[in-house]
Amino acid sequence: GVNINLGAHGQLQGLGAHWELWMLEQGGMTNMQALRAATMNGAEYLGMETEIGSIKEGKLADLIIIDGNPLKNIQDTENVTHTMINGRLYDAPTMNEIGNKETKRTKFFWELEGSGNAYPFYQQTQSFMRPVCHCRM
């Protein structure tokens, strides 16, 4: 047989990773097999099973805490309450660091005043309304 891994083709993970996990279960895997595909199989494929993929002393502390039991309901993987990255614990809804050192997260670039605000320019010039061809005939 072959190992099945959860993963994308280069795009960032996100909600799609949960959907893919759920589809593995819908395709016939047990919840444990699907969770293994999302964790340990990928670590083994990368040759990093001694560093990542499961919870064990000495491994990197990157994990999520879920409100629910994905072994009973695989869709509980969506109910992330906390995330641990490199041993630092974060509150999932706020993304603030909690635990030993409480730190409020900084704003993302799209939350900054005026970021990505090209619309007034296009509204003034009406250039978003006109088809433009820069080719030479």
Predicted regions and their residues:
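C-terminal cap of metal-dependent C-N hydrolases
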Residues: 40, 44, 60-101
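Active-site neighborhoods of metal-dependent hydrolases
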Residues: 1-27, 93, 98-107, 111-137
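His/Asp/Glu-enriched, well-ordered alpha-helical/loop segment
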Residues: 1-66
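Short, charged low-complexity intrinsically disordered segments located at boundaries
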Residues: 52-54, 69-73, 111-114
